[in-house]
Regions:
Chain B
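Short, amphipathic alpha-helical interaction segments embedded in low-complexity terminal/linker regions
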Residues: 1-135, 142-145, 166-246
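An amphipathic, hydrophobic-aromatic interaction surface with interspersed Lys/Arg
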Residues: 160, 165
């Protein structure tokens, strides 16, 4: 089949016609669209021409023609039309022209499809579409992009100021920036985004500078929140999504970072004030705003910590002041009770803040912890926080306690007490005081409720581990066993006629390791009681050999009948007091020294005893001279004239201050603990530097107490002397474990 | 000696006086170091001691002179006699060096074995030789390494048999003696501090670490590391110095001039 050769001129002509037609259509001139015949004609012409062999191979010229045509069109029509306009109008024109251009290129690519394929295949030239785009970029974009960008930014700023702008237009312009990058984002990023960000920065910098001076902290935050939201929306409406992070950061920086200190420290409305005034909503906002800004968030957390610490310390100070201004002990005790209650409340309040305002963020948990670690380690009127907490527990757990609460409330309170314990660094001190109080409650039957005792021990066990509570649990169990044992003892008495103590006797056998250490005294027991002891010993030996019983008379209670002139009154006294009183069955009148000799007690003990019997509320003995204090030259007589409206009275004996002993005991325990820790560490590490050894020991021991570095050093040296460790010969800062 | 020039002769004399070596050794050493005294000392000290033959019979005689009539040991009287013979004060630190050579287990007595070991190590079998060796022994104290050995030896030697620690008074006495040799400006303050604040025996660790402290930490405490592993007592000492204004702003104020 012979195809007619299409000459160059002819071909070019066809091409031009086609291009012109499209141009006219796009220009909006009255021009009928392509009909299929025209279309086919053109398409085929190009097709055939591409297949023509040399010398009729004019594809290159066709290509060139195409290029020229595009270039010409752009230069003569497109560019001037854009240049002719300004601002928004220019943008509209640009958008229109760009849309047209894309359409044109599409049509032309279809029309001259084969040219495209042929050329690109043969000679690796840019496609017709690509050429067209490149021209647009090089001729139009290069020329106008600065003005376009400025126009866009102006519109953005207008919108920021509250004016309505044509968002669709902006979207189109920005899409153009993206598309003109031809696969790369660099045009958008370098020619638009960078400048937009800078402008944003400047914009918010100005705003922030004004607002920070004029507005309160909450208002400023509201405005900032608004602005940041709007900027995010802006991205959704017309900016490219890749701008979101950068835009937010820039705006955030100007609004929240640059002035962060001024904002948080604002005198009448800053963070401290918001905390003080419980402005939960504002604080939540503050958190939300700063949650992405670590530096800022840390500042907020610090203020939070300082605030809690200050409030806590203030409570402590209140208690301290109240305690020192009141003379009597009782009132001081109350203040301390109140203090613990208030600290619990403080804790509850701010835990809520952490969960609600601060969305459980770790920084705020830490701030809370650190604050309470300070507050909970303060001393009040000489009592350490460990002691205060045990006194508080005592009040909750004992029958006559000041805390009259429902079971549920008690449970809750005990929970909270255990939580507070986590903040106290001297936990071993707490354990020791607790044991002492527990002992008193158990032995003098002052515990309100066995279940409660067990409940708190369970909670303590959960929080601090089994080792913490094992002794205490042992104590509670001992009492249960003691009751059983007593029943057995009574059976024994019944079945053994020889065993007659002569007095009703109840014995509680304590397992030594569990209970606090008590001094057993060398009290000369009254004869009546000696028999009791013997009988019980007899019984006990039938149950177990190999156990040694040590009698702690200081813990005993005695019911004595006092046959006074008016009436007989039953006196409930301690065993020691009973021993004193029974002396008066044999003698009418005794001197201090006689009593001392007969009973074999220490001066301290004896003074206390005699005071409770002759100078306190109930004067069972009368004293010569009738002064309010006991001196070694006093004489005592049975006060037969004594009477009371009750038939049975309890004569209290004020307890010795245990504090010193507890502190000493704990000190000793700590030395052992430090020793053990050092050995443990060195045994596993074999060789270790001093600093590391100290820090590992501190870590191990911190569960129970905060060890004194000097104490650790002393123990290390002790271990060197005992040949467990030695210093390295070369480096005196290194220690070696000696097996 | 006649062939030597005066300068060389002087050097030989000096060498012999300081090291206690014989003329022959002195010549050897000096020649080896091209007649530089310091070099000669290095040569001499780095060579193993030339053990001259010691006659055991002479040693027996010597031992018998000093030994206690009732026990087979040299006791306090014997030692005093020895010191007299040597023309040395019994409190002289050189006697400590002698004890060190003997590896004596405790002060104021020498067993026969210790006596023999010591004198043989020093190449002594007569009083004359013993006297000659005195200056050598004094020189040993100047050697850093030997001084440390002697110092640490002193602890075990001075303490009571069976005790782990050294009684404070004895320790102070020893320190005064030892630090007179090896000048330490803080020794008096240290002793005062101990008497005022410590009043207990001194552990071996504290003893040995004190030397390191004296050696490495400057008297104004400018390079003292409070976080270091110094024994607790030394930390307290530093506190004491600071509290009492003896060290102010890293200056050691000399109290002796302030009265």
């Amino acid at each position: 089949m012979n195809r007619k050769i299409i000459g160059l001129e002819e071909g070019l002509g066809y091409m031009q016609d086609g291009i012109t037609k499209i141009e006219r259509i796009l220009e909006g001139r009255p021009e009928p669209p392509f009909n299929s015949e025209e279309y086919m004609k053109l398409y085929t012409t190009i097709y055939n021409m591409c297949l023509q062999t040399p010398p009729d191979d004019h594809t290159q010229q066709l290509y060139d023609k195409y290029r020229q045509a595009i270039q010409g069109y752009i230069t003569s029509t497109v560019l001037p039309s854009i240049r002719a306009k300004h601002d928004e109008f220019m943008l509209k024109e640009l958008v229109k022209r760009w849309a047209n251009h894309k359409v044109m290129l599409r049509w032309l690519s279809h029309l001259f499809y084969y040219l495209d394929r042929h050329l690109i295949a043969c000679r690796s030239l840019p496609s017709l579409k690509e050429v067209g785009l490149l021209y647009f970029r090089d001729l139009v974009y290069r020329d106008v992009h600065v003005k376009v960008r400025d126009a866009v930014i102006t519109l953005i700023d207008k919108e920021r100021e509250g004016e309505q702008v044509d968002r669709a237009l902006l979207k189109n312009v920005l899409d153009f920036f993206v598309e003109i990058g031809m696969g790369q984002m660099n045009r958008y990023e370098e020619d638009f985004e960078a400048h937009m960000l800078q402008d944003t920065g400047a914009y918010y910098s100005r705003k922030a500078s004004n607002w920070i001076l004029e507005d309160s902290c909450p208002d400023y935050m509201l405005k900032s929140e608004e602005c940041l939201k709007k900027e995010r929306d802006r991205v959704g409406h017309y900016l490219h999504s890749s701008s979101e992070t950068k835009l937010s950061e820039r705006a955030q920086h100007e609004l929240l970072v640059t002035h962060v200190n001024q904002l948080l420290d604002k005198e009448h409305s800053g963070c401290r004030v918001l905390l003080r005034d419980d402005k939960v909503e504002d604080l939540s906002r503050m958190y939300r705003l700063y949650s992405k800004i670590p530096l800022g968030l840390k500042l907020v957390a610090d203020i939070f910590k300082q605030h809690i610490t200050a409030e806590g310390i203030a409570l402590v100070q209140q208690a301290e002041d109240a305690a020192s201004s009141k003379a009597s002990n009782a009132a001081a005790g109350v203040q301390e009770q109140v203090l613990i209650r208030k600290i619990i409340e403080l804790h509850d309040k701010y835990v809520e803040y952490v969960t609600d305002c601060f969305e459980n963020h770790a920084l705020f948990h830490k701030a809370l912890e650190e604050a309470f670690e300070v507050v909970c380690n303060e001393t009040v009127a000489g009592s350490s926080s460990a002691e205060l907490l045990t006194t508080f527990c005592d009040n909750v757990l004992k029958k006559s306690g000041s805390e009259k609460l429902s079971d549920e409330a008690i449970e809750e309170t005990l929970e909270k007490v255990v939580k507070l314990l986590a903040y106290i660094s001297d936990k071993d001190l707490f354990a020791e005081f607790y044991r002492k109080r527990l002992a008193r409650r158990l032995l003098f039957d002052r515990s309100a409720n066995d279940d409660r005792e067990r409940s708190i021990l369970t909670k303590l066990k959960q929080q601090r581990g089994g080792q913490f509570t094992s002794k205490m649990e042992g104590m509670v169990t001992d009492l249960t066993l003691a009751r059983e044992n007593q029943a057995n003892f009574e059976d024994y008495l019944r079945s053994n006629s020889a065993a007659r103590p002569g007095i009703d006797l109840t014995v509680t056998v304590l397992t030594t390791g569990f209970w606090p250490s008590y001094k057993s005294s060398d009290l000369n027991l009254p004869a009546e009681m000696v028999k009791c002891v013997e009988v019980f010993k007899g019984f006990y030996e039938t149950k177990t050999k190999h156990r040694k019983l040590t009698w702690i008379y200081s813990l005993g209670t005695c019911h004595i009948s006092g046959k006074f002139e008016q009436k007989t009154i039953e006196l409930i006294v301690s065993t020691y007091q009973a021993a004193v009183l029974l002396l008066f069955n044999a003698s009418d009148r005794l001197s201090y020294s006689e009593i001392m000799a007969q009973l074999n007690l220490t001066h301290d003990d004896l003074v206390r005893l005699l005071h409770s019997l002759s100078c306190a509320k109930y004067q069972i003995l009368s004293k010569e001279p009738n002064t309010k204090t006991i001196s070694q030259s006093d004489y005592f007589k049975f006060n037969s004239k004594f009477t009371d409206k009750l038939r049975r009275i309890k004569i209290p004996l004020p307890p010795v201050d245990e504090r010193k002993q507890v502190v000493d005991d704990v000190g000793k325990q700590r030395r052992y603990a430090i020793d053990a820790a050092i050995v443990r560490v060195m045994k596993s590490r074999k060789v270790l530097g001093y600093q590391q050894l100290v820090s590992e020991c501190v870590e191990q021991l911190s569960r129970m107490f905060k060890p004194d570095i000097k104490a650790i050093k002393k123990q290390i040296e002790d271990l060197i002397t005992r040949e467990y460790l030695e210093r390295d010969k070369e480096n005196a800062n290194m220690f070696k474990y000696l097996a | 000696m006649h062939k030597l020039g005066r300068g060389h002769r002087d050097k030989v004399q000096q060498f012999m006086t300081i090291t206690g070596a014989s003329e022959k050794i002195a010549l050897q050493a000096l020649k080896a170091s091209d007649w530089h005294l310091e070099g000669a000392f290095d040569v001499f000290y780095s060579q193993p001691q030339i053990k001259s033959y010691t006659d055991t019979r002479h040693l027996e005689e010597l031992y018998n002179r000093y030994k206690d009539p009732y026990t087979d040991m040299i006791l306090a009287d014997g030692i005093t006699l020895l010191c007299n013979d040597l023309q040395v004060d019994p409190q002289d630190i050189v006697m400590l060096v002698v004890s060190w050579h003997m590896k004596a287990s405790t002060m104021c007595e020498y067993s026969k074995q210790e006596f023999f070991i010591g004198l043989q190590a020093l190449g002594i079998d007569s009083l004359e030789k013993f006297r000659e060796r005195i200056s050598f022994m004094r020189s040993e104290l100047k050697d850093e390494q030997k001084f440390r050995e002697i110092y640490n030896f002193a602890f075990g030697w001075a303490k009571e048999k069976g005790q782990k620690s050294l009684a404070l008074d004895t320790a102070i006495g020893m320190w005064q003696l030892l630090f007179a040799e090896k000048q330490w400006p803080l020794v008096d303050h240290w002793c005062q501090f101990l008497q005022a604040r410590h009043n207990k025996a001194i552990s071996r660790d504290t003893w040995s670490q004190l030397l390191e402290f004296a050696r490495t930490v400057d008297p104004a405490l400018s390079n003292y590391d409070a976080e270091g592993a110094w024994p607790y007592l030394i930390d307290e000492f530093v506190e004491y110095l600071n509290e009492n204004g003896i060290i102010q702003n890293s200056q050691l104020t000399d109290w002796s001039q302030k009265r």
